């Protein structure tokens, strides 16, 4: 059962404008990355369902989060069908994220009162997702179109809350452009949590980089 409701989950995402997403078969690595994000001030985390170990890792992370990261909302990403959505919800997912728009997945989430963040690319998909109950939408792959695309979408659809993921660069100028375009949050995955950084166990460096990213979003928001 979800620990946090939609209002709380979206507040956690929007407060820092950052959503970390990660997947690794070694649960200890996942714990270390989650600790890094938590120490940097993040209170929401997406574990992506991108390999056969993801579900078992997720189930084991739920009690870890409750004990060691009590303010963290843990969600499941890369959820492609309603059966998988229900399975992760039953395991304790606070929210469900997908790279695509699937009405059946949305219905499972709505029926279980669990926030659903579907992946969309066109204004038509985004409006349809919103009508199906998605309060927040993921623009994916955002890096292939850039901030100007989001700005044009927000013009006629200003009520949409949009997270951008997929090839989003993390330099100050790019982050600034996304925020100016009206982004709700930026999804951060392999751009920060690279295999090289994980293999080197460079967790102090990852924490410092995450803090610097949060400072950029907070600085821009305050201007």
Language model features with spans:
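Conserved N-terminal beta1-alpha1 strand-loop-helix module at the mouth
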Residues: 1-74, 79-83, 87-91, 180, ...
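Catalytic beta/alpha-barrel core
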Residues: 21-23, 43-52, 71-80, 93-101, ...
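Catalytic cores of alpha/beta
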Residues: 81-91, 124-132, 169-186
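Short acidic active-site motifs
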Residues: 29, 57, 83-84, 104-105, ...
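Short beta-strand/loop segments at the ligand-binding rim of alpha/beta enzyme cores
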Residues: 15-18, 65-76, 94, 108-117, ...
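Glycine-enriched alpha-helix->loop->beta-strand junction motifs that scaffold or abut catalytic
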Residues: 41-43, 89-96, 111-117, 131-136, ...
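Glycine-rich phosphate-binding active-site loops on the catalytic face of alpha/beta enzymes
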Residues: 95-105, 139-146, 182-203
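Glycine-rich beta-strand-to-loop/alpha-helix junction loops that act as flexible
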Residues: 76-77, 164-168, 186-190
